Structures are given as C-alpha cells and as structure tokens.
Amino acid sequence: MFKKKEQEVVSVEERIDYKYSEDRILKELAEYIDKTYNAHYSHNKFQATEFIMDSGHGEGFCIGNILKYSQRYGKKDGKNRNDLLKVIHYGIMALHTHDTQEKN
C-alpha cells in the first residue's frame, strides 16, 4: 500500500508579504523548538514534561508556563526574546493537548 504524503506546513506556491516578519519568526521558532529536543533535559530517559502531559495535567502545565514566561518577560537580562519563544512553544503544546482531548 502507498503511504499518504504529509502536507507541507508552509505553501511555496504563493509568496505572502508578511507585515510582521511572521515567516522569519516561525522559522526561528521551529529552530528553537528543535534545539529543545537536544537540550540537557532531553538526555534523561524520562522527561518531567511528558509525565505531566501523560497524566492529564498538560493543559494546566502549559498555561502555567505561558503565564510564568509572560510575567518574566522584560525582567531578565538578555533572555527576553527566549521568554517570548517559550510562551509560543507552550502555546503550541497547549494546542496539541487541546486537540488531543477533543479527539477523545
């Protein structure tokens, strides 16, 4: 049998003139997320985040981290941009949790 080809995330057929650098920021976000999979926490056999998500507390965990990093933004030297990337990453994880719960 043939395997269904996955859809591309970004359309290359039509070039959109983004006003707020969304294309560049989405690329940067993807690179940031990729790096989290190679971070020092990811080398452990079990991840705390996975335990939390698998035990049904993922949505609250993600929302809590969104609040934490949103409130911290602008208060930590040199890490402000990373705080915003973390907010978006936890937002994506919250969407994943939401979508997974909606399917069940």
Predicted regions and their residues:
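Intrinsically disordered, low-complexity regulatory regions
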Residues: 1-104
